[in-house]
Amino acid sequence: MLDPRLSVAPMVDRTDRHFRFLVRQVSLGVRLYTEMTVDQAVLRGNRERLLAFRPEEHPIALQLAGSDPKSLAEAARIGEAFGYDEINLNLGCPSEKAQEGGYGACLLLDLARVREILKAMGEAVRVPVTVKMRLGLEGKETYRGLAQSVEAMAEAGVKVFVVHARSALLALSTKANREIPPLRHDWVHRLKGDFPQLTFVTNGGIRSLEEALFHLKRVDGVMLGRAVYEDPFVLEEADRRVFGLPRRPSRLEVARRMRAYLEEEVLKGTPPWAVLRHMLNLFRGRPKGRLWRRLLSEGRSLQALDRALRLMEEEVGEEGEKEKPGPRGQREAAPGPAREGV
């Protein structure tokens, strides 16, 4: 059964396997999504590079984009074979590239095609096929139109709807589309009341766990995006307060785990910066956090991370962890729980 309560949004050039691994160290319960992946890339590209992920990343969803039912169905089959727990169809990307390719938000103009796509994908796989959509297009959305779109997709077998609670303005940039169209989370709340048999996840502009908890009283789930990338420890209390799991490790312990991960990845030929760039915000708002960023940005190596870690060990200590007497009476940090992501 898909647990929709809390998830991290698919973000292009952000939610790759390295960032997802980092997030999993902060929260065991949160649901992870890949970057948006076009169906043709799955069919013709390097599948191992595009789709491979570590077992620790579960639960994880593959987000696909495209406009051809057969191609998307085949891409969904491939994703399921790789072990993804969910296949999500992007109906929200407003970018010029998406419009040229006939996928993303512009597909909302052709609900008959959307239904055909979703039916084909649903018949191709056994895992849930879900959608991530906007309220509508060009600021002309109405609640009635949104509800009709949901009904049409539900008839095609979709049970889970992730709704970015904004319209898509196709003449604007992707960044502007995250900021200019007004948020209408109340429409998503209303959808849950009108379609109680369906699952609704609201998304857009949610910056804190407190905000997420507010919406969780009204809908089935909340998806956070940029806030998590800007500070992964927005999710610090998510396991305890949302999933009833023990509190996760401190920032310093997560940094140490990422150091071990980076060492392993470098041996596989991964450029260090591919991992380090996602770690820049790990100490956001903390003492010496800016120096941490600078050391990683300038050094871009395992050695640079080691220097930054030594700095944080001296300046921050074992944040959030109890201390116990050392062998000679000095104070030392008690070891954190030896839990790894599952």
Curated annotation (Swiss-Prot):
Catalyzes the synthesis of 5,6-dihydrouridine (D), a modified base found in the D-loop of most tRNAs, via the reduction of the C5-C6 double bond in target uridines. Specifically modifies U20 and U20a in tRNAs. Its EC number is 1.3.1.-, 1.3.1.91. The record marks 90, 97, 175, 178, 290, 293 as: Interacts with tRNA. Belongs to the Dus family. DusA subfamily. The gene is dus. This is tRNA-dihydrouridine(20/20a) synthase. The active site is at residue 93. Keywords: Flavoprotein, FMN, NADP, Nucleotide-binding, Oxidoreductase, RNA-binding, tRNA processing, tRNA-binding. Its cofactor is FMN. It holds the Pfam family Dus. GO terms for biological process: tRNA dihydrouridine synthesis. The keyword Metal-binding does not apply. InterPro entries: Aldolase_TIM (IPR013785), DUS-like_FMN-bd (IPR035587), DUS_fam (IPR001269), DusA (IPR004653), tRNA_hU_synthase_CS (IPR018517). It catalyses: 5,6-dihydrouridine(20) in tRNA + NADP(+) = uridine(20) in tRNA + NADPH + H(+); 5,6-dihydrouridine(20) in tRNA + NAD(+) = uridine(20) in tRNA + NADH + H(+); 5,6-dihydrouridine(20a) in tRNA + NADP(+) = uridine(20a) in tRNA + NADPH + H(+); 5,6-dihydrouridine(20a) in tRNA + NAD(+) = uridine(20a) in tRNA + NADH + H(+). Signal peptide: none annotated. Residues 313-331 have a biased composition (Basic and acidic residues). Residues 313-342 are annotated as: Disordered. Gene3D superfamilies: 1.20.120.1460, Aldolase class I (3.20.20.70). It is an enzyme of class 1 (oxidoreductase).
